[in-house]
Regions:
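Long, charge-dense
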Residues: 53-87, 94, 100-101
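N-terminal interaction modules that seed assembly of large macromolecular complexes
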Residues: 20-59
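Non-catalytic, well-ordered alpha-helical scaffold segments
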Residues: 5, 34-41, 57, 68, ...
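Short alpha-helix boundary/capping elements
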Residues: 32-36, 44-49, 67, 103-106, ...
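A charged, amphipathic interaction segment
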Residues: 81-148
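Acidic, glycine/proline-rich low-complexity segments that act as flexible tails and inter-domain linkers
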Residues: 8-14, 18
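N-terminal intrinsically disordered, cationic/polar leader segments
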Residues: 23-26, 72-76, 108, 127
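Amphipathic alpha-helical segments within well-ordered protein domains
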Residues: 25, 41-45, 60, 78-82, ...
C-alpha cells in the first residue's frame, strides 16, 4: 500500500527542482498532461512497480475528472486575478490565499490517485517505466533529463 504523505514528499522534492518544474508546467500547458500523474508514474517507477496500460488509463480518467471539477476552474480564477486585478491593494494576499487553496486541491488529487493505485496490482519490475505509458518518448526523455 502506498502512503499519501510519502508520495507528497517525493513530489514536492522533485518539483522543487526548477528545471523539473519548468518541464512539468510545459507538459501541462503545451501537451495537456497532468503534473501529479507524471510525478506519480515516476514515483512508482522509482519503487519498481509497473502499472498496466489499463491502470494508467484509469488514473488518467481520475486526474481528468478532478482537473475538470476543481483544479482547472481554480487555476482560471487565479489567472483572472493576476491578469485583471493585479492593481488591487491586497492582491498579494489574495494571490497567496488562492495558491494555498490550490495546493490543497493538488493534495486532494494526489490522494485520489494514490487511493486508485492502491486498488491496482502493479507488478514488481526493476526496469519499470510507467511514464512511457502516458507520455510520448520525447517527453519521457525531457522528464528524465530534468530529473538528473
Amino acid at each position: 500500500m502506498l502512503k499519501h504523505d510519502q508520495f507528497w514528499h517525493y513530489a514536492c522534492q522533485l518539483y522543487s527542482n526548477k528545471q523539473m518544474e519548468e518541464v512539468l508546467l510545459h507538459f501541462q500547458n503545451a501537451h495537456n498532461k497532468n503534473v501529479n500523474l507524471c510525478l506519480l508514474l515516476d514515483y512508482l517507477t522509482e519503487l519498481g512497480k509497473q502499472l498496466s496500460q489499463a491502470d494508467v488509463e484509469a488514473l488518467i480518467l481520475c486526474a481528468a475528472k478532478l482537473d475538470q471539477q476543481l483544479l482547472s476552474p481554480y487555476r482560471l480564477l487565479r489567472r483572472t486575478l493576476k491578469d485583471e486585478h493585479h492593481a488591487y491593494p491586497n492582491y498579494a494576499s489574495a494571490r497567496s490565499s488562492l495558491l494555498k487553496a490550490e495546493l490543497e486541491l493538488e493534495k486532494l488529487q494526489q490522494h485520489s490517485l494514490i487511493e486508485l493505485v492502491n486498488t491496482c496490482l502493479p507488478s514488481h519490475n526493476t526496469g519499470a517505466n510507467n511514464l512511457a505509458l502516458y507520455l510520448p518518448e520525447s517527453l519521457v526523455h525531457q522528464f528524465m533529463r530534468a530529473k538528473s
